[in-house]
Amino acid sequence: MNSDETEILERSDYISFATRKRSGDWVNTPVWFAPDEGSYYVFSAGEAGKVKRLRNFRESRIATCTMNGKLTGDWYDTHAYVLDEPRDQQIALAALRKKYGWQMRLADFFSRLTGKMGRRAYIRIDP
């Protein structure tokens, strides 16, 4: 990605995050994301399919999209990693809270309330 493409991507509220299945097919999911030091961070339920797929295939791709997943930009090839270290997870959470503010804090509140906060997975995406 060049700097103009990066700027357009980072202005978006959502990206379509595509992970690869064993069959080679791609599964697209609209997600919140936050930039930090050249990487992008997302979160998901720990048992979600995208998390399981990333354990097998680090290849991924991202594109800007609407909240409902309708693509609004081009695909970019990336590599993604599930973050297992608490320090790395805190970096991801801080980046997401910085970008989404009260919305992320509200999501955190309900995740704690329902017991899902501890089962969250944080993912780093490297362009």
How should each PLM-predicted stretch be described?
Residues 47-122, 126-127:
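Short, structured beta-strand-loop surface elements
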Residues 4, 19-23, 107-113:
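Short helix-to-loop capping/linker segments positioned immediately adjacent to catalytic or ligand/cofactor-binding
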Residues 8, 20, 26-27, 34, ...:
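Generic detection of intrinsically disordered/low-complexity segments and helix-coil linkers/edges
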Residues 3, 10, 40, 78-82, ...:
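Residues at structural and domain junctions
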Residues 1-7, 39-50:
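Short charge-dense sequence patches
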